[in-house]
Amino acid sequence: MGKLYVVPTPVGNLEDMTFRAIRVLKEADLILAEDTRTSGILLKHFEIKNAMQSHHKFNEHKTVEGIVNRIKAGETVALISDAGTPGISDPGFLIVRECVKSGIEVQCLPGATAFVPALVASGLPDERFCFEGFLPQKKGRVTRLTSLQEEKRTMIFYESPYRLVKTLTQFAEFFGAERPVSVCREISKIHEESVRGTLTEVIAHFTQNE
């Protein structure tokens, strides 16, 4: 029986790719990529020429059975996403769950993920926190925010820059305008930035500077 490797890839800076991640990808029989075009650039940079197949939220329910069967037959499969660690607000959970059900060994390599550096650099309490990822766009959004109104721990959210001010404004409505917040963007890139302050202050910053 083969094995499934979950391989983190850089969230911005290619120097964050680990030696082990490169080796695993070069040794894999098949690389599952969220977007083969995006991952193709990464693989080309590190001279990785192994077979690659798209694996994303729109096709994973159809392809997971075939992939599991290939691993059962002895193949080594590596799963990557466009950036960061697969399964963290990215495809990955479904195939990992099915591999575990089938008794297939799953190894997740340590490596890049966006929320850890953002949290540590925020200056907000990080000994206890809750990760919420992306909020629902429509249905369930208000319900989710309402359920979090009494949450005292540091909460971590992902958001598109195009929806940032709208989401921060909702946070002020549900969590209080004076709640401290940190917005981290362009993580590990040249223009990395963390904007810290109350929700009122940070909303004003991005309203004026976007």
PLM feature segments, named:
Residues 1-58:
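Glycine-rich, flexible N-terminal cofactor/catalytic loop recognition
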Residues 3-4, 73-78, 154:
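Loop/turn-to-beta-strand initiation segments
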Residues 11-12, 82-86, 161-163:
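Short glycine-rich anion-binding loops that position phosphate/pyrophosphate groups of nucleotides
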Residues 53-62, 134-136:
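Conserved helicase motor
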Residues 64-113, 117:
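Glycine/small-residue-rich loop that forms an oxyanion/phosphate-binding "nest" at active or ligand-binding sites
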Residues 75, 154, 158-210:
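A contiguous loop/helix-start segment that scaffolds small-molecule binding in enzyme catalytic cores
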Residues 94-151:
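Class I SAM-dependent methyltransferase SAM-binding "motif I" and its flanking Rossmann-like core
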